[in-house]
Amino acid sequence: MVVRETLPVVVVGAGPIGLVAAAHLAQRGLPFLVLEAGPDIATSVRRWSHVRMFSPWHFDLDPVAVSLLTSEGWSSPDPESYPTGGEFIARFLEPLARHPLIRPALRFSHRVTAIGRLGRDKLSGHDRAGRPFAVRVMTPTGEQELLARAVLDASGAIPNPLGGSGWPAIGERACTDSIDYGMPDVLGRDRARYAGARTLVVGAGHSAFGTLLDLVSLAEQEPGTVVHWAIRRRSLAGRLGSLQDELPERGRLGQRLARALEADRIVLHRGILVDRLERTSQGIVVFAGERALPPVDRIVCATGYRPDLELLRELRLALDTVVEAPVALAPAIDPALHSCGTVPPHGVEELTHPQEPDFFVVGHKSYGRAPTFLLRTGYEQVRSIVAALAGDWEAARRVELRLPATGVCGGEKIEACCSERDVTEKETDQSTAVAKRPLLLVGGPERARLRPALEIAGPACPWPRPARAEQGVCCADRADEPVCTCESESAGQTCGG
C-alpha cells in the first residue's frame, strides 16, 4: 500500500517557475522531483536568449530563490539593469539549478506524457482524492510511471497557429520549413535565413514588435530585405504603448516601432485574418479570404500562446471554457472583462481544482489563452501553493506581490475594454451586436453559469472574443503575443511559465 504523504511533489518543467517552485519546496523541506523534457533547464527561454527583457532584475528574482543562492555565495545582478534571456539563465536560473538542494532532484530528457490518479481513470470517482498521482514519463531509458503526492504543472504554453479560426491555416503545415513561431534571432543565429529575404510577421504583441525592429535593422545591413506586417485590427490607434509605462523598455519598444512605420520601413497590412497559405513560384502567398498579400520568403508567427492540455486529459479539471484557465482565476485575467489594471494577486485558492486536490497548473500555462502573465505572478503562485502543501495556510493565503502600477497592459490608460476611440466607425455595428452576447464561463456542467452580457459604454470589441489586454487597449486581436514570456517560446519580457 502506497502512503501518499511519503511521496515527492512532482514539478513538470525546469523553466523559471518550475525552478522557483523547487526553491520553495527545498526551503520548506518537502521532497520533490523536477521533470524536464529538454536536455537542460529553461529550454524555451533559450529560444529567445537574444532578447532583452522589459523588466529590470528586481522584478525577475524570487526572494526565496535569492536567499538560497546567497547562502552559496551568489552575488545579485544590478537590480536596475535589464537582462537578456541568456543573462537571465546564466545569472539566475543556472546557479539556482546547481544549488545542492535542487540539483539532485532535476531529471532531464524526462518528457511527461500523461498525469492521472493511480488506478483511477477520469470516470472513476471512488476514493479518487486519496489516491496518489501517477505521472507517465518518457525517459532516455524508456517509459516509466512515477507516483506523487502533488503535482505542479509548470510546462509552459505552446504557440498558436497562423490560422485565424484557432487551428492551422490551410497550407500552414506544408510551409513549416519557412515559418518560425515565436521570436527568431534574425540578427544572430538565424540571420542567414532572413538576410535579403521578404518576411511577413503576423501578430501585434511585443514579440512581434521586437522581431519587426530586428528585421528593420537587418534591412539596413542586407540589401533586398523587405519587412511585411499583418495584423487583425484595422487600426493601430493606442496599440504602440506609452512612455508612461512603469516598465520603460516596454514603452520605448512601441515608440521605436511607430517611428519605423512612419519612415515606411515596414509594409503594414491591416484587417488580416489568415485562412490559407499557398507556395508559388514567386514565394509564399498568404490569403485572408479573397485578399492575397504580396509573396514572401519567410513568415514569423507571433500570434500568442495556449496551454497544451493533452497530458491532463485523465484529470477532472475545473477550467474556464473560453480562457482555459482555472475557473476561479479566469474572471480576473479574461481579456474580454479585464481592464488594463493589474491582475489581482492569486495563489493556492484560485488555482485549486476541487475534484483534483493537490494538482496545480502554474506559470504561463495557468493563464490559459490569456496573454498577461508575469514572472512575478508565477513566483507568487508557487510560493502560496508550496506553503499550503507544507500546511502553512497562513502564509498560503497571505499576499506577497507587487506588480507595476501600469499593470500587465503596459500603458497609462486604465479604463474599460474597448473605449470608443479604439474602434473605427466601420467596426461599430458588428461590435455592438457582439457585446451583448452572454458567454459561458465555467468548465463542467455541474458548475455551469452564464457570464452576464457585457454592457460597455460605447462600441464594444470588434471581434467576437477579444483575446488580450495589452498596451492600454484591452480590445485586441487574438493574433497577438503575450506581454512577456519566460517559459513560453516567444520573446521573454517579464513573464514565464
Walk through the language-model features, giving the residues of each.
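A Rossmann-like FAD-binding core segment of flavoenzymes
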Residues: 114, 216-320, 387, 393-405
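N-terminal Rossmann-like FAD-binding beta1-loop-alpha1 element of flavoenzymes
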Residues: 7-34, 201, 208-218
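Glycine-rich dinucleotide-binding loop and its adjacent helix/turn
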Residues: 85-88, 153-221, 227, 323-333, ...
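C-terminal, flexible cofactor-proximal segment of oxidoreductases
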Residues: 270, 306, 321-497
